[in-house]
Amino acid sequence: MHELSLCQSAVEIIQRQAEQHDVKRVTAVWLEIGALSCVEESAVRFSFEIVCHGTVAQGCDLHIVYKPAQAWCWDCSQVVEIHQHDAQCPICHGERLRVDTGDSLIVKSIEVE
């Protein structure tokens, strides 16, 4: 369950930002999850609640936004949207793709009190 370590990293980022800006309470967090990140929403929600306990983010609302993955096709030299790791290029059907975005979990926004 790598969702737990991803959420721990996210909460560390949130804590650092809260300390830098003298924030006492985080009320909402938006996480951006890439289509190829291999994380399950239910596991993220469960893990996030656990790692937020005792932090400025405890009890905050968690919003999850999904982001499609983008890859560079070496065969047709185009940036394309993909939805799985073993995808083919939707333009030329080539299989030589380099994933550029969409394989991460990012703290996109934090709402504070």
UniProtKB/Swiss-Prot annotation:
GO terms for biological process: protein maturation; protein modification process. Zn(2+) binds at C73, C76, C89, C92. It comes from the Bacteria. InterPro entries: HybF (IPR039002), Hydgase_Ni_incorp_HypA/HybF_CS (IPR020538), HypA/HybF (IPR000688). Ni(2+) binds at H2, E3. Coiled coil: none annotated. The keyword Zinc applies. Disulfide bonds: none annotated. Keywords: Metal-binding, Nickel, Zinc. GO terms for molecular function: nickel cation binding; zinc ion binding. The keyword Metal-binding applies. Belongs to the HypA/HybF family. HybF subfamily. Involved in the maturation of [NiFe] hydrogenases. Required for nickel insertion into the metal center of the hydrogenase. HAMAP family: HybF_subfam (MF_02099), HypA_HybF (MF_00213). This is Hydrogenase maturation factor HybF. It comes from Escherichia coli O6:H1 (strain CFT073 / ATCC 700928 / UPEC).
